[in-house]
Amino acid sequence: MNIVNTIKDVRLIIKKWKDENLSIGYVPTMGYLHEGHTSLIKKAREENDKVIVSIFVNPIQFGPKEDYSTYPRDLVKDSSLCEKFGVDLIFNPETSEMYPNKIYSHINVDILTENLCGEKRPGHFQGVCTVLTKFFNILNPTKAYLGEKDAQQLAVVKKMVEDLNFPIEIIGCPIIREEDGLAKSSRNAYLNKQERKSALILNKSLKEALKALESGEKNLNNIKDIIVSKLNKEPLAKIDYVSIVDSITLQSVEKIQSSILVAIAVYIGKTRLIDNFTFKL
């Protein structure tokens, strides 16, 4: 397995692979890898000749009061995990490699970024789309693998790839959970013992909502109320948003047409966690 830090070097490797007509699966990450990431790597390994993982904590997708400086990093552990799961190449550029000068060009995806995390984290998806556009141009992958836990990000990136004619297939992979139901996240590392226990309220509230939908509840305001009521019973939980949107357009819906995304963002102490599920008629 190679670990490469420069765009020049990674392009030389990619060119060789492309000359040999090899397919490339790409997993973009910010590092501090967990089982959610390794599920993406395994899928990429199954479907491609070569697998690349990028590890880059992207500064332009963090707001001024967010956790860029404290975001967990552990390249040694990440490298070991990547090697274990058959990754061929880790691309781990410095910030100065990705952004050597002040950046004037940004990628925005309208409409899909107007609510959910896009509303609560202004500029976040512009940063995500800009860095992924750079990575797609540098790495030229056949397929890219993203987790469904970040459902809005997945929808936004799919639309960006469609609109800008990137010759890349975007593959969404299911949420991976701890045994007790908490969605795997690098930010779970911030939680102390009590907060970790309290964080289970996210999945519990969504489970109640899903159960109501499966039992025939069609009033989406009632579904929201079920989630809010459950979350409010947890003292350490502070709701950022509870939203029900069309799973493709991410626009708010008043009734279920075909497929809905039920998404929540909740602060447990100072840590912001997200979770979701999709429900189809």
Curated annotation (Swiss-Prot):
Subcellular location: Cytoplasm
Remarks, miscellaneous: The reaction proceeds by a bi uni uni bi ping pong mechanism.
Pfam families found in the cross-reference section: Pantoate_ligase
GO cellular component: cytosol
Database matches in Gene3D superfamilies: HUPs, Pantoate-beta-alanine ligase, C-terminal domain
Residues binding ATP: 30-37, 147-150, 176, 184-187
Protein name: Pantothenate synthetase
EC number: 6.3.2.1
Enzymatic class: ligase
Domain of life: Bacteria
HAMAP family (alphabetical): PanC (MF_00158)
Segment forming the signal sequence: none
Catalytic residues identified in the record: H37
Major site of localization recorded for this protein: cytoplasm
PANTHER family, per database record: CYTIDYLATE KINASE/PANTOATE-BETA-ALANINE LIGASE, PANTOATE--BETA-ALANINE LIGASE
Subunit structure: Homodimer.
Keyword Thylakoid: no
